[in-house]
Amino acid sequence: MKIQMLKAIVATTTLAALGLGATAANAATATATARAKILRQITLTNTSDLQFGIIVTGVAASTVAVSTAGVVTCGAGLVCSGTTTAAGFTIGGTTGQVTTISVPASVTLTNVALNTMSASLLASAATTTLVANAGSFTVGGTLSVGASQPDGDYTGTFTATVNYQ
């Protein structure tokens, strides 16, 4: 009886071992590669402000436009003088990477008496490719000057945003 029980244990152990071996024969392996691309943190620096210059108003509403190249166009009924510039920005980042540029559609300029004017904004490019870890763009705009616009120094701020594409 002991011999039969011993034979049964050996047979069961052998079958179990054979079963485990059969599973291992059906196994497969594959390898994968882990990758990461590190980009420099983007920096954005304002190098010049959008300057519409000195404007003498008339009795009718008109506009003053400063192109992205800084060229001024003075609307009918206005007298324009002084320095005009497009806003300038420099971008720092990783060479060869494309960046997207966005600016708000407009900015409100306000004087100390809380009188306002609105200027539409336009960036010189929607994207730029960084060369030697750098790029740049400008922002021009068209200022809407009201009829007999109250005098004063008007200012407003806007935020330009740059991201990797």
Q: What kind of region is each of these model predictions?
A:
Residues 1-12:
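Bacterial N-terminal signal peptides that target proteins for export
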Residues 4, 15, 128-129:
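Generic detector of short alpha-helix boundary/capping microenvironments
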Residues 19-21, 122, 158-159:
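Alpha-helix boundary/interfacial micro-motifs
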